[in-house]
Regions:
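A solvent-exposed interaction/effector surface
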Residues: 1-146
C-alpha cells in the first residue's frame, strides 16, 4: 500500500490497512498468516510503498481480493539484491547509515550496479525490544557485464 508521511509513521499507518487485509478484511473474510519481513520503500514522489509478503502456499490467483482499495497485490519479479543486516531500533538515522554503507559497498564492485530503490525490511513486531530487532537494507542490483 502507498502511504504518505514521515519515515517512522508510515509503517504504522500502512499496517492498519495491510493488517486489516490479512486479519480478514477481504472479500472472503479469510485470515492469512503474517509473514516477515515488512518492507518499506520510498518512492521518487516522496511517498512510501509498504508491503507484506504472502505465505508461499498462495498465489495471486488463490488470494482473496482486498476490500480496501488502498491495498493492492502484485507478484514481485525475480530480482537480485545486495543486502546488509543490522540489529536495533527503527530510526531513520540507523536505516540511512546502513543504506549508505551498502551503497558504498556496491559502488566498490564495478561488476554490479544499483537497479532500483533501496528497501527497508523489518523482521520483528513492535513489541520486540529494539536491541533484539533484526532489520535489513536491500538494494536491487544487476551485473554490469555478464
Amino acid at each position: 500500500t502507498q502511504v504518505s508521511g514521515d519515515f517512522k509513521q508510515v509503517g504504522s499507518d500502512a499496517f492498519q490497512k495491510l493488517g486489516g487485509y490479512i486479519f480478514g478484511q477481504n472479500v472472503t473474510d479469510e485470515k492469512i498468516a503474517m509473514t516477515a519481513p515488512v518492507t518499506q520503500t520510498q518512492s521518487p514522489d516522496g511517498s512510501y510503498l509498504v508491503s507484506f509478503f504472502m505465505p508461499s502456499k498462495h498465489s495471486l490467483d488463490t488470494l482473496p481480493n482486498p476490500t480496501d482499495a488502498a491495498v493492492t497485490m502484485v507478484e514481485m519479479p525475480e530480482t537480485y539484491f545486495a543486502v546488509t543486516r543490522y540489529r536495533g531500533g527503527w530510526s531513520q538515522e540507523k536505516y540511512l547509515d546502513n543504506e549508505q554503507r551498502l551503497t558504498d559497498a556496491i559502488d566498490a564492485m564495478p561488476e554490479w550496479e544499483v537497479a532500483g530503490e533501496p528497501i527497508w525490511a523489518r523482521y520483528d513486531p513492535p513489541i520486540m525490544p529494539s536491541f533484539f530487532r533484526t532489520n535489513e537494507v536491500l538494494i536491487p542490483v544487476r551485473q554490469t557485464r555478464p
